[in-house]
Amino acid sequence: MAELTAQQVKEAGLAAGLDAVGIANIERLEGAPEQMQVANIFPECKSVIMTLRRIPRGVYRGIEEGTHWSNYTFYGYNRLNSFFRPLGTYRLACFIEDHGWEAVPVYPGVAEAEPSRAPVRDGQVGANVFPAIRIAAVAAGLGECGWSKVFLTRRFGPRQRLGMILTDAELEPDPLVEPNSICTLCMACAQVCGGHAIPHIRENKFVEIQIEDKTYRWGDVDMGKCTATHHGLNKEVSPFLARDCPGLRLNIAEQEISEEEAYKLAYTVAGGTWRKTDEFPTGNVVDYYKTMLQSTGYYAVCGANGCIRECMIRMEKAGNVENEFHEEFRKKPKWQLNYKGEVVSE
C-alpha cells in the first residue's frame, strides 16, 4: 500500500483547487460534546483534515455599493459551501482513498435539532452528529475564531469557507495558531453589526475552549438576532424588506428572538405568497427573497456587514492580511438604513 504523508495530502488538496489544508490529530477534538464528536461519525478516525477555499473579496462589492446582492449568496455563502468548495474536498477524499485509507468528507451543516433522532443502536448517540467546523479548523492550525466567531486566517482574514475530511490515516498535525495572533479584539465587528448581535468585549459575554495548552475565546453571539438579520428580517440591512413591507417597524436590537424563531419567521416570509394586488402585483411577500430561494435554495441579505466586511476592512488597513490588494475596499461613505428602512448617514 502506498505511503501517505501530511505533505502529500496538502499538495493534493492544493492541486484539487483548495486554498489551504490543515490537519488535526483526533485527540485535539476529544473534548467536544457527544453530538459534535467526529469519532461518533467515524470511530476509527485518527486525523481530521480541514479544507479551505477563499471568499473572493469582490463577492462583497455589490452589497458594499448597495446595488447587487445575489453574489454574496451564490459565491460567498451557499454555493461556495455547497458546490465550489466541496469539489476540492471530494477530490482530496478520493486521493486519500487511492492510498488505501478511508476518507469521510463531512458537509459543514447543522442538525435540525440535537439530537435529531433517537439512537438507532444501543450505546451510541442519536442522529445527526455535526462537528463544530470552525473549532475543528482551529484544531487543525488553519487560524482562529475572531471575536464575532467568524473564522480568521492570516492569508484571507475573515474570507473563507471550510470543509472536513475524517480519515483513519495517521498524519502529522499542524501547529496551533496562538490565540489573538490574528484577531486583535478591535471590536469593529461588534460596533458595526446591523443585527446588534455581537457583544462588546466590555459586556464580558464570551465562549471559551481549550485545545492542548491554548485557550481560545470569542463573543457569545446572539444567534436569534444574527439569523434574523442574515435572512433579512432587519430593515437596517435590507432595502427589500423596507420596500415590500414599508409600514413594518421591527427593531431587531430590542428583540429577544431565538435562532429557531428567526429561521421559522424568515423562511416563512421568504417563501410566502399572498394575493396579488395593485400595491403588490407579484403576490410574493418579499420579491427578492423568493427570487433567491428559487435560484439557489438559500438567501443571505446582510452581507456579513460587521463580522466579515468591517473586519476585512480593518485587517487590510492594519496590514494584517497576506492577500493584499492595490486599492482599499471601501471607496465611499458606507450606506446605512435605520430600523424603519430610512436612509441615514454613517
Mark where each language-model region is.
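C-terminal non-catalytic accessory extensions
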Residues: 307-346
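Short beta-strand element of the conserved SAM-dependent methyltransferase core
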Residues: 49-51, 165, 311
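Catalytic cores of enzyme domains
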Residues: 32, 74, 78-304, 313, ...
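Flexible, active-site-proximal loop/turn residues at the rims of small-molecule/cofactor binding pockets
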Residues: 27, 55, 171, 199, ...
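Short, solvent-exposed secondary-structure capping/transition elements
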Residues: 60-61, 104, 320
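Non-catalytic, usually N-terminal nucleic-acid engagement modules in DNA/RNA processing proteins
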Residues: 1-90
